[in-house]
Amino acid sequence: MSCSRTVALLAALWLVVGATSSPVRRSPDLEARRRSAIDRSMIRFGRSYPPEPSAADIREAFERPTRRGNSFLRFGRSQPLTLSTDDLVSLLRAYEEDYDTPMTKKSASFVRFGRDPNFIRLGRSADDDKSAFEQNSELVVSGYPQRKSRARDHFIRLGRDSEEVNENEFEETEESRRKRSADSCHDCQS
């Protein structure tokens, strides 16, 4: 009798566990609404796959920023692009148009971090034809003449320029030092 009770108890326990472990079937609409509500309330970390890129997106991704003068910031890696034949044709046509038109303006300085040109770099470009940029530039900083080394002309000057300083200004007389010293100040000693 105790054996049959044990078997009956195990069968009942097995049925309860089996019933609770199987999920309840829901309608597809209800399930879709539940999933979209969860998706809206969650913060996702990780990669998301964007919709198919357009030809303009592909053109923008493949353009060389130093050629067109575009400025951009990119941190990390972007998703790989999937190209269709229409996108490739429009991309090739855009490149033909870019290389047929003469370049009117180049920028001698750009921003890049790291060695790869896809990243941001701070400082001057490593182009060999820097002289072309310096000759074409019409930079005049507050009336100063342009010098051979023009890097200083691109910054704001604070104080006196080294070309204006006279050697006579460094020679001070004893009287001018005494005027500025704290020893001659009567209010300071009290």
UniProtKB/Swiss-Prot annotation:
Keywords: Amidation, Cleavage on pair of basic residues, Neuropeptide, Secreted, Signal
Primary location class: secreted
Phenylalanine amide found at: F45, F113
Localization per Swiss-Prot or TrEMBL: Secreted
Sequence ranges of Basic and acidic residues compositional bias: 175-190
Leucine amide: residues carrying this PTM: L158
Signal peptide residue numbers: 1-21
Tissue: RFamide 1: Expressed in corpora cardiaca (CC), corpora allata (CA), antennal lobe (AL) and gnathal ganglion (GNG) (at protein level). Expression in AL detected in most animals, in CC, CA and in GNG in some animals (at protein level). RFamide precursor-related peptide 2: Expressed in corpora cardiaca (CC), corpora allata (CA), antennal lobe (AL) and gnathal ganglion (GNG) (at protein level). Expression in AL detected in some animals, expression in CC, CA and GNG in few animals (at protein level).
Prodomain residues: 22-33, 69-104, 116-150, 160-190
Region span, Disordered: 161-190
Record bears the keyword Ribonucleoprotein: no
GO BP term, pick one: neuropeptide signaling pathway
Biased composition (Acidic residues): 164-174
GO CC entries: extracellular region
UniProt key word Signal: yes
Family: Belongs to the FARP (FMRFamide related peptide) family.
Function statement: In insects, FMRFamide and related peptides have modulatory actions at skeletal neuromuscular junctions, and peptides that are immunologically related to FMRFamide are released into the circulation from neurohemal organs.
UniProt protein name: FMRFamide-related peptides
